[in-house]
């Protein structure tokens, strides 16, 4: 069973690179729009209602050709009723590559995106990502596709690493503070006993 994702929606404009929202996909078959799971990109996402398997597809394609190597990321909202075997095919300069996605698991990037890999593209051809529902069980979800240059992808990875490091440091400091408070509470209170010593009287000298 996938984790419940409580994140709020992200705007397309807040993401780097070229982002194609589900509204821009060329669809075959009947897809259902939804905003039930809030971790979507744009104005919502779509699902196949767990019906009509094999008859429904979604094609994401860039407005123009891409020149060079790009990292391709696929966005979806996870859930326990999602498919574990969604085939997503990237068409690139060297041919086609199909990746099988488990949509019950929270995506690792921003809790929304999963990397499909890095591929070379030709400037003369539009990049395409095809989502199929053949042989899937459970709801198939489409939300967005992101294309990042290698430099953009590496930068995003470093930013994410920095955020993770900050969170880890904060968590470690919190844990150390908690341990210190526990140790302090365990120490017995030592009573300070103060005594007054009488000064020796100095007699008169003869």
Stretches with model-predicted labels:
Residues 93-124:
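Extracellular carbohydrate recognition and processing domains
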Residues 58, 62-80, 145:
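A short beta-strand element within beta-rich, extracytoplasmic domains
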Residues 11-38:
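Predominantly extracellular/luminal regions of secreted and cell-surface proteins
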Residues 1-16, 104, 115-117, 135-206:
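Substrate/cofactor-recognition hotspot
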Residues 70-74, 116, 125-134, 145:
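Extracellular beta-strand-rich recognition modules
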Residues 69, 83-87, 126, 142:
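Exposed beta-strand and adjacent loop surfaces of beta-rich binding modules
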Residues 79-98:
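Short, surface-exposed beta-strand/strand-loop-strand elements in extracellular ectodomains
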Residues 43-64:
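Short beta-strands within extracellular/lumenal beta-sheet-rich domains
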């Amino acid at each position: 069973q996938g984790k419940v994702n409580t994140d709020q929606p992200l705007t397309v404009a807040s993401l780097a690179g070229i982002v194609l929202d589900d509204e821009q996909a060329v669809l075959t078959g009947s897809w259902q729009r939804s905003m039930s799971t809030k971790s979507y990109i744009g104005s919502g996402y779509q699902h196949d209602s767990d019906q009509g398997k094999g008859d429904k597809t979604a094609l994401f394609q860039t407005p123009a050709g891409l020149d060079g190597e790009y990292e391709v990321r696929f966005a979806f909202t996870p859930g326990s009723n999602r498919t574990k075997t969604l085939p997503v095919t990237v068409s690139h300069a060297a041919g086609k590559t199909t990746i099988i996605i488990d949509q019950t698991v929270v995506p690792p990037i921003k809790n929304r995106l999963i990397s499909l890999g890095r591929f070379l593209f030709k400037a003369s051809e539009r990049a395409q990502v095809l989502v199929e529902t053949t042989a899937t069980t459970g709801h198939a979800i489409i939300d967005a596709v992101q294309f990042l240059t290698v430099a953009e992808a590496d930068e995003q990875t470093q930013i994410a690493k920095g955020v993770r490091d900050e969170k880890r440091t904060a968590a470690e400091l919190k844990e150390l503070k908690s341990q210190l408070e526990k140790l302090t509470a365990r120490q017995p209170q030592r009573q300070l006993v103060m005594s007054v010593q009488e000064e020796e009287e100095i007699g008169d000298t003869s």
